[in-house]
């Protein structure tokens, strides 16, 4: 269940990058 939060963090970073574009 440690991979779940890790994926969310990665997704959040990608979302932030897309929002900046």
From Swiss-Prot:
Keywords from UniProt, A to Z, are: Amidation, Neuropeptide, Neurotransmitter, Secreted
Places the protein is found: Secreted
Any single GO CC term annotated in Swiss-Prot or TrEMBL for this entry: extracellular region
Name the domain of life.
Eukaryota
Residues with Methionine amide modification: 21
A biological-process GO annotation = regulation of heart rate
Q: Where is this region: Disordered?
A: 1-21
Q: Per the record's keyword annotation, is Secreted included, yes or no? A: yes
InterPro entries per record: Tachy_Neuro_lke_CS (IPR013055)
Identify its protein family: Belongs to the tachykinin family.
The free-text function statement in the UniProt record for this protein reads:
Tachykinins are active peptides which excite neurons, evoke behavioral responses, and contract (directly or indirectly) many smooth muscles. Is a potent vasoconstrictor and secretagogue that plays a regulatory role in the central control of ventilation, in particular, the heart rate variability (HRV).
Name of the protein this chain belongs to? Neuropeptide gamma
Organism for this UniProt entry? Oncorhynchus mykiss
